[in-house]
Amino acid sequence: MGACLQQVGGGALFFCRGEWFFRFTMMENPDKETKQELAMTEIVKMRDVRFDPGLFVNFSSGTVLDNLLCSYQGLPKGVNYMIIGDPGVGKTTIILDLIANIERQNAGTRILFISAEMNEIDLAVYVQRYPMFGNLNIMFVESDFDGHRHHLQEIEEVLQQGWDIVAIDSFYELQGIVKEEEDITMRLAETKLLALIKRHNKAINDTHTNTTFLTIQQVTKSGAFIGSNRLKHMITAMMELRLDNPKNIYSDRYIVFSKHRRGDVGVKLYYNLSSTGDVTFDEQRYRQELQLRNLQSNVSTQLRDFASQFERLFNNEIEQ
């Protein structure tokens, strides 16, 4: 087991082999034997693990995007989806549209948007164009140049209330704010944020809610994801927003997953931001791409079958 990095209520968070673990224990400095004893309690059989059935009931947005979010449709609970994309492709708009639709489709769902990149004036422009964004709960996080505020503590207190979905724009900017305010390294700031996210994934909050995080992340000039391997490994899915022609901001835009533990990768869903009031998705084009993928898969299967049959016939001829 890795070293204890943070005490949480009646237990502690541990980091080991790229994963976070929570263990209930009041021991602050257990000896070697106790650590080994406690580590053994982490070994389980999944058939013995029990979950609330509601954990596997997804949040529906009422759009075709639900098909990409999960193989059994909708946004799952207690997961981490990271969103990256080319500048100006509409990452914030897509996420705000998604959570606004989920809130509209699922009465009583508690959703929070943490904005570390835009202030109230910036978001007012979004609300004018997409009025339904005005109903969202938003927490603005801005750098405190006076050094009196500690946004990490404020975020911890707010998240402790228990939220179904938390969207962050962006992780890198929030990480930088935490670094400056707490006077720590970027790596430690990342560690603290990851520990916080993992804790709420596992429903360690006042309402025992398995929180889903939608985290927008910045990219390099080449479009590559910014972040450590720890951050990359703990995410459930990587949603990419891309342009057909990266050099032309007016070219067609699409959503595609490059990593997905809950659904398919490589399936494109084209979208349009030109309409006022809502994001529009090209469902017909999406269905056509699915048909083409299925056709390619069937052809590949047939070719493998023919190759296997030929190999068996060839081997039989040699034996005879």
Q: Where in this protein do the model-derived segments appear?
A:
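N-terminal pre-Walker A segment at the start of P-loop NTPase domains
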Residues: 41-69
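Conserved P-loop
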Residues: 77-149
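Phosphate-binding/switch region of NTP-binding enzymes
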Residues: 84, 201-301
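Phosphate-binding P-loop
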Residues: 70-78
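Phosphate-binding/switch loop-helix module in NTP-utilizing enzymes
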Residues: 143-206
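Structural motif
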Residues: 82, 165-169, 214
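Cationic, low-complexity basic patches in intrinsically disordered or flexible, solvent-exposed regions
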Residues: 7, 20-21
